[in-house]
């Protein structure tokens, strides 16, 4: 069992607070916890940068923080794009032939709904429009196409949505055997599988961000609940696993934060702000 968040007594050195979104900052119903804007302001008053680190694209994350996106950092697309105060400071691109190969397999794999991520845009097959209710939560600008074959766009990530909530099974049995030597694959919960270039993950995104901020990884606090948070949790000085996370995640955190439905991230931020005063 991880020590409680109350055991972290070196909070005054923190300069960056990075949090995953789904099942970490957000409640189970996808709602933002009450008071998050006040906490971002409080961190800023003490020179501490707030960062949303997510598999979601930059546009969706900016819209999640309408009053603060110009004052915060965003690690989007699992580290494939990084923004600091609305400025793109890093981006990565997947080879076009390679993303077409992934899409071709996904199109022909039952239960797979592929999404080609192109920074603020996303491309989805017309046949999968029935899933728009879910997809639009994560992708604000969706273009539906009859086929991926003729697409020639810059892409930093491929995502696959699994309505059967069996992403790990599909990762192990279908996609990892085909691509894990050429791409980094990670599950984002039970319903999503993400593909980025090898070396691209939330951890690499945080590394790019701290380089631009001129701070050390030891001065970063990070919060997460699932597989795609592991690279970020493993490298920071203050890693918090949410109480609602699966037990295997405890190996990747130093402390246990209250659950997402208890606004656990905000509870720890309050302690960070108090230590900075």
Task: List the model feature ranges, each with a label.
Residues 2-46, 50:
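N-terminal glycine-/serine-/threonine-rich phosphate-binding loop
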Residues 6-16, 32-33, 194-277:
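Mg2+-dependent phosphoryl-transfer enzymes with acidic/Ser/Thr/Gly-rich catalytic loops
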Residues 29-131:
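Active-site phosphate-binding/coordination module
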Residues 36, 61-65, 171, 175, ...:
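Hydrophobic packing residues within well-ordered alpha-helices of enzyme cores
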Residues 43, 54, 78, 158, ...:
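Residue-level signal for inorganic ion chemistry
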Residues 67-70, 78, 178-181, 235-236, ...:
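Short, structured coil segments at secondary-structure junctions
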Residues 71-77, 92, 135-136, 239-243, ...:
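Short hydrophobic/aromatic-enriched beta-strand-loop microsegments
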Residues 101, 110-223, 227-231, 235, ...:
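Conserved acidic, metal-coordinating active-site core of Asp-based
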